[in-house]
């Protein structure tokens, strides 16, 4: 039994050293934090009363001129959602390494103790439902 474990770990260890190109390379800050047309850095938080409002914020590159968010009462299969759409407020932001648009929406009049699903995008390109 010990021989089996020895040979297993030996072959596993040799595989690691046989592929030195699998070592992660360091990207520059400019590339690592580069915004794209697809939404990223999606953050959900509450606004005013957390029982009836939620706020969502996300980032895109500056080619995305409008942001849109959808929210719907969640169901068990996730396919037959009937979302309500909200236009986002879009803000330009310039940092020392890039430029981006930040989008924000406040969902109001939500039912308390109810599970919702939401997604964000530009009306064509969307995140998955969260």
Language-model segments: which ranges?
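Acidic, histidine-bearing metal-coordination/catalytic regions of metal-dependent phosphoesterases
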Residues: 18-130
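Bacterial N-terminal signal peptides
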Residues: 7-15
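Positively charged n-region of N-terminal signal peptides that target proteins for export
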Residues: 1-4
């Amino acid at each position: 039994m010990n021989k089996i474990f020895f040979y297993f770990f030996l072959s596993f260890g040799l595989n690691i050293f046989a592929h030195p190109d699998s070592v992660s390379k360091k990207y520059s800050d400019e590339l690592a934090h580069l915004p794209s047309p697809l939404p990223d850095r999606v953050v959900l938080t509450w606004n005013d009363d957390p029982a009836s409002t939620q706020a969502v914020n996300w980032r895109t590159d500056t080619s995305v001129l409008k942001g849109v968010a959808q929210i719907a009462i969640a169901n068990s299969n996730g396919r037959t959602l009937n979302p309500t759409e909200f236009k986002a407020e879009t803000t330009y932001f310039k940092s020392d390494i890039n430029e981006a648009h930040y989008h924000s929406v406040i969902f109001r009049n939500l039912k308390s103790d109810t599970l919702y699903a939401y997604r964000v995008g530009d009306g064509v390109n969307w995140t998955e439902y969260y």
